[in-house]
Amino acid sequence: TRLAFGTYNRPFAPNRTGADWISASTANVDAYLADPLCGGDPTTGLFREMLWGIWFITYPGNLRRMDPDVPVLFLSGEEDPVGENGKGVRRAAHALRRAGVHSITLKLYPGMRHEILNEDDRDIVYRDLLCWLRHRLPSQEA
């Protein structure tokens, strides 16, 4: 676990816990650490699937097979080390643009880390997601 995720906490030193990178909310970090279903050691299967997924999305031919008219939404915390503080998320969006995808929306949330849906300001994220969906899904008027 340290080999794969060990550097994520460094930007938040001095660290209160080993999972400070998860959220800016100490209550959320504490809930994560107290949850027996969270924070376990990742399996080799997880790493196999993750590495396969990374390979798949970085192979340009696979991205070009995507329907260019399907809208894509990227949401990330601006302080999420998994997304390289937005740099990795921007690269992913740029790769899709290069592959011909027309409708890409990217939103980075200042002060938020990895679990943007559990941060103190999560209502902003949910509102943005709902707004994005409403603008792209057909109306269900009766």
Regions found by a protein language model. Name each.
Residues T1-L37:
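Alpha/beta-hydrolase-fold enzymes
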Residues A31, E49-W52, R91, I124, ...:
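Alpha-helical elements of Rossmann-like donor-binding domains used by nucleotide-donor carbohydrate transfer enzymes
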Residues I57, A99-A142:
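Catalytic active-site module of serine/aspartate enzymes centered on a nucleophile-bearing elbow/loop
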Residues L63-P68, A99-V101:
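Short, conserved loop/helix-junction motifs that constitute active-site signature segments
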Residues F74-S76:
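Short beta-strand/loop motif that positions the catalytic acidic residue
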Residues E78-P81, M112-R113:
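Acidic beta-to-alpha connecting loop that harbors the catalytic carboxylate
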